[in-house]
Amino acid sequence: AHGTELLEIARQRQVNFQFEASVGGGIPIIRPLYRCLMGERILEITGILNGTTNYILTKMDKEGASFNGALKEAQDLGYAERNPEADVEGHDTCRKIAILTAMATKKEVNYQDIYTEGITKITDIDFKYAAKMGTSIKLFGSSRMEADQVFAWVAPVMIGREHPLYSVSDVYNGILVRGNMLGTTMYYGSGAGKLPTASAVVADIIEEAGHLDNHVSLGWSSEKLDIAPMEISCHKYFVRVSGPYEPKKQLIEQCFGSCQIMTLEGLNECALLTEKMSEKQFKEALFELEEKLGGMYQEVLQTIRAQL
């Protein structure tokens, strides 16, 4: 929250402010953005940026654990705090994608402007559908830089096996950076723990030792970056609805158009995967569906964004 202020103090005092360990634990990402990719125009950054939530989601995916059960195990192992809100509600990931977006755009990013949704509503049933679809669910922090707009958000996302971040499991982090010339590069490694973080801190100390007599303008300016409204961001959506599919087939098609429909044996519900649409269009269609389901004593059980 005070990154811009600290960078300005460092500039005024002609000293250096290093913060490699602020994102990704031991993964080098701040310095690559500043040095190795300095000739690139960064178009997109998407990552699994929180080891705690990734551990929880991995347990739910691979072992069928409940959210509460996986969270307790993470706490017992020291991966999650006694008060895990910053992790599971997505706030930690939000602050990290804000830092990466600021590095990419060279402008100040207020993390409070970034749409943020955590993993507390994800259930073991969601993962059963994901397994049937050949997908998984990950908590993403993402920013996309277009000609006149910057989109940034944090949310659980359903991804397929072909996605580069599909196999990033447990407390590991993975970050994709797409540039205008190089294309996509991936940064992967341990995103939590004292030794990975210590590795990044020591690297900063060594870096600083090479610049004792000069100021390195690492970071961003005080100019504020405007984040585009989430309503115009486009995704596919996974939706679970109570009750059998057949009586609702026409209703679902009226609201969402062509959809992929699926069911799980033994459950009195169905799920659908929409085509790509804006957040605003999805909310309007969802509201219409919920209104009509109310008369049938049925309800929407879950919604998750998808990159499929």
For each feature predicted by the language model, list its residue ranges.
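Short helix-capping/linker segments at secondary-structure and domain boundaries
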Residues: 63-66, 104-111, 209-213
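A generic structural signal for well-ordered alpha-helical segments
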Residues: 9-10, 74, 130, 251-256, ...
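Conserved anion/nucleotide-ligand pocket segment
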Residues: 34-95, 100
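A conserved regulatory-domain signal marking ACT and ACT-like small-molecule sensing domains
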Residues: 205-308
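Rossmann-fold NAD(P)-binding glycine/threonine-rich loop
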Residues: 1-35
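Catalytic, metal-anchored helix/loop core of enzyme active sites in primary metabolism
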Residues: 44-46, 54-57, 73, 79-83, ...
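Substrate-binding/catalytic subdomain of NAD(P)-dependent oxidoreductase enzymes
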Residues: 71-167, 172-174, 193
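Conserved active-site and cofactor/substrate-binding residues in soluble primary-metabolism enzymes
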Residues: 24, 28, 40, 62-69, ...
